[in-house]
Amino acid sequence: MRGPELRLVLLALVLCQAPLGPAAPVSVGGGTVLAKMYPRGNHWAVGHLMGKKSTGESRHVLEGDGLKELLRDDIQWEEATRNLLGLIEAKGNSSHRSPQLKPLSTHQPTLDTEDSSNLKDVQLAKLVDYLLQGLKAKEGALS
């Protein structure tokens, strides 16, 4: 009994020791199931968002004034983020020099004589510039 015969006998012994019955192991005596089996995994919420459509406005659909306003807002958010990061870095610096003050926006929007809302935006941007410069100066004086 050598070679393939021995292998078959060992395989038969191993298979005879395997538990018979359900795929999931159960406690001795057939009590409660140790773990609930999900044949496709435990992904109960896999498809609950399938087929949903966005109800918000698409940024690519906007045209004309809406697009200009959106771009202006994006530029303002980007500049505000840069200034905030500059403040955080300046606060994290252990040096006692004051951070350089620079205007919030180096890009000055063109003024249309017909568009009074654009003038308000420019004035608001200047006001925000002055306020941020004041905050930076105060932070520089405290450190």
Curated annotation (Swiss-Prot):
The keyword Ribosomal protein belongs to this UniProt entry's keyword annotation: no
Keyword field contains Signal: yes
Cell location: Secreted; Cytoplasmic vesicle, Secretory vesicle lumen; Cell projection, Neuron projection
Annotated segments matching region Disordered: 91-115
UniProt biased composition (Polar residues): 92-111
Transmembrane regions: none
Function description: Stimulates the release of gastrin and other gastrointestinal hormones. Contributes to the perception of prurient stimuli and to the transmission of itch signals in the spinal cord that promote scratching behavior. Contributes primarily to nonhistaminergic itch sensation. In one study, shown to act in the amygdala as part of an inhibitory network which inhibits memory specifically related to learned fear.
Name this polypeptide is given: Gastrin-releasing peptide
PROSITE patterns: BOMBESIN
Protein source organism: Cavia porcellus (Guinea pig)
Prosegment residue ranges: 54-143
Entry similarity comment: Belongs to the bombesin/neuromedin-B/ranatensin family.
BP GO annotations: mast cell degranulation; negative regulation of voltage-gated potassium channel activity; negative regulation of voltage-gated sodium channel activity; neuropeptide signaling pathway; positive regulation of behavioral fear response; positive regulation of peptide hormone secretion; positive regulation of phospholipase C-activating G protein-coupled receptor signaling pathway; positive regulation of respiratory gaseous exchange
